[in-house]
Amino acid sequence: LYNALYGSDVISETDDASRGNKYNPERGKKVIEYARNFLDENIPLFKSSWKDISEVPKVYNGKLSLKLKDEKQFVGYSGTLNGLSSLLLKKNNLHIGIIFDPDNKLEVFNPEGNQDKAKVHDIILESAITAIIDHEDSVAAVDAEDKVLGYKNWLGLMKGNLQTEFEKGGKKIIRKLNPDRIYTKSEKKGEPNFNEIKFHGRALMLNRNVGHLMTNSSILLKDGSEIPEGILDAFITVTAAIHDFKSKGNSRTNSGYIVKPKMHGPDEAAFTDLIFEHVENESVR
């Protein structure tokens, strides 16, 4: 949340809070203030405010040292009891993670170090439950070269090793898939203490194939004509998804998830069913 707020127009650039080419502490203050207001609105404290917190909270006997207005919003934590590295909270069954950095070990863009008085490094929000990876023809994958790149990226997502590097502010940044997040459960009546819980660090990914009417020059048939692109998509994207079955990094049920657009009536829907029947039969061989 901190990085997203800092780099967007959600935070005004007035009052010396411009984004600029280097880290601006005044803008950083506005980011922290916005985040505290967000927590006060969604995870309110009992007769207090997140703005008043000046140290990393602790957990005693499975219970949080901070008194929440609704204690059921405390889900779990990671780190040691006296040195939390994160808190897991929830609102409307969507989770909010607060990451702490009491020893200033995590990298920040501020040359002076973490300016958050409670040593909050970041706030992580549970986002969309699903994400569509688009292989459709209109924009995402127009020609054969686009298609191959799209398949390569999808394979990397299914293997869990896709990453990219770029420069920001003179520093090399690596973006890669988030690992699963491990927490210790908060104490609740009827449950043993210190049960471990795991949350997927990534949204569930679905692949949007093309509709039936398109062809693609990435594979040519014996007569020189282009392959029906929807059939190609079905076999390649599902085959790549098999890599995920062992790790369960995406599917919890050893499944591949396909979005099939632009079906014009029952005949085309039946043809889709026939395609995926063949895909499943070939995949289990």
What is the role of each PLM region?
Residues 1-271, 277-284:
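Catalytic alpha/beta active-site cores
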